[in-house]
């Protein structure tokens, strides 16, 4: 994390007039820069959630957020010149639409990857389904647990009683930590 911060400062030795950050993880990692060299530089944070990990260890561990390991985004941001654009999930509305279009659905398959935002979204869909759709079964299909080939096999086995929500499916290839969509051709 410190290396990423150093790389940003080395790449941009002159403080910018403003910074746009996409996603809470990018903000949590780069916020210390705004405590020092870029203090008071305006920030626009896109796709933020109401709560964020209380520390980087929680973010990097990719564990579900709880009241104990997270804080309200307003609290985290109180010392910064920041505007937050929240991104709602619309999970309940999506599930209502699926039920309206396919009333025979008894199970929801949720496709996601191993990134932090997918962990948070899986947590949110579990909560919404337990509260508002208790008679729907949830099946989580995650790139950290199954391969792309297994995902495709699973999807082809579904009948009309399964609704599918695709959220994300990024896979890491090799040790270079670069992520690619798994349907891209590798050279």
What kind of feature is each model-predicted range?
Residues 1-187:
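Short hydrophobic alpha-helices and adjacent helix-cap/hinge residues
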């Amino acid at each position: 994390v410190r290396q990423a911060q150093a790389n940003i400062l080395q790449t941009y030795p002159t403080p910018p007039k403003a910074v746009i950050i996409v996603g809470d993880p990018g903000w949590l990692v780069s916020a210390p820069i705004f405590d020092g060299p870029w203090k008071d530089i305006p920030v626009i944070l896109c796709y933020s959630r109401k709560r964020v990990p209380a520390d980087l260890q929680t973010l990097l561990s990719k564990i579900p957020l709880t009241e104990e390991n997270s804080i309200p985004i307003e609290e985290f941001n109180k010392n910064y010149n920041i505007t937050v654009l929240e991104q709602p999930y619309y999970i309940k509305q999506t599930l209502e639409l699926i039920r309206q279009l396919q009333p025979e659905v008894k199970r929801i398959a949720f496709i996601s990857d191993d990134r932090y935002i997918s962990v948070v979204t899986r947590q949110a869909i579990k909560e919404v389904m337990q509260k508002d759709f208790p008679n729907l079964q949830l099946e989580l299909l995650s790139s950290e647990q199954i391969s792309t080939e297994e995902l495709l096999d699973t999807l082809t086995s579904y009948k009309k009683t399964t609704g599918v929500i695709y959220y994300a499916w990024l896979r890491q290839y090799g040790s270079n930590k670069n992520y690619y969509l798994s349907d891209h051709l590798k050279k």
